[in-house]
């Protein structure tokens, strides 16, 4: 085993200029991450200098068997925390050979919104709170829970410490450090209300980079749980009953919101979000109706609400923002399995571009 470990950790730069690039994309379900690697002649730090690539789309539910080629367009580069050295992770989006974006390519439309001059001028910042649940591999049951049974009720687990409260911290901490190494703007982690559930935060990130960084962080988490023999679930309500669901609270501000008088801009933006509540809910993740019940720190899915420091509302404004008269707000509706490209661009579109 030590020889295998030695080989995995070989430093390629000692013998060659060549690097390994892991191309990553979103598969046909919209949540399944896929990747494959290729050798490149030397270090690359600009995605525009990376070659396009292709894969068998019929095996990812993205193309028919008789016309199966799908093209990968490199869009963002991160350092590879697994191979290290000059090796890289490459976030890609997917196109037909004719250059048309696939239906599962949510980045394409998001990039159009984020490149709109009105959006560019507002420099939208995002902070995404990605919740997830760690599961025991073969039984589809949360890490640390007794098989066929339940732990004690919620209360001691949120930000909890100790072997009877925190399950999977080694995975969480490994993921945290790997994301920092990769160059992802990860800003923190914490244990969540339901035992076996955790959260990491990405941001503040500007525009399209928020989506790139969340997908890269999800990929790294999938790889680490693979090594640990656990499974990560982004289901918004993995365990029915009196247990918290999993969300992806999305914190947001624009230049106008961050400047003097920004609180009035925030209130107008929230009003617009309320007018498009149904459209946002439809785009905020599958199965979200199981989570947004009005209980467990959620608002009811059918009703839009907002409030200061209210975690039972659709949108929450922080006390500091109210006090300072400027800042940001938190959209609490997105589910843990949301597509960050969809959510971030839709918030920008509604609050900046959409005219009621």
Curated annotation (Swiss-Prot):
PANTHER family: GLUTAMINE SYNTHETASE (PTHR20852:SF110)
Gene3D superfamilies in alphabetical order: Glutamine synthetase, N-terminal domain, Glutamine synthetase/guanido kinase, catalytic domain
Domain spans labelled GS beta-grasp: 19-99
GO biological process, any: glutamine biosynthetic process
Tissue: Roots.
Catalytic reaction(s) noted: L-glutamate + NH4(+) + ATP = L-glutamine + ADP + phosphate + H(+)
Domain GS catalytic residues, every copy: 106-356
Keywords, sorted A to Z: ATP-binding, Cytoplasm, Ligase, Nitrogen fixation, Nucleotide-binding
EC number: 6.3.1.2
Gene Ontology MF: a single term: ATP binding
One Gene Ontology CC term in the entry: cytoplasm
Family: Belongs to the glutamine synthetase family.
Name of this protein: Glutamine synthetase PR-2
Region (Disordered): 37-66
Localisation per UniProt entry: Cytoplasm
Nucleotide-binding as UniProt keyword: yes
Positions of disulphide bridges: none
Predominant localisation class: cytoplasm
Quaternary structure (record): Homooctamer.
Domain of life of the source: Eukaryota
Note: There are at least four isozymes of this enzyme in P.vulgaris. Irreversibly inhibited by the herbicide L-phosphinothricin (PPT).
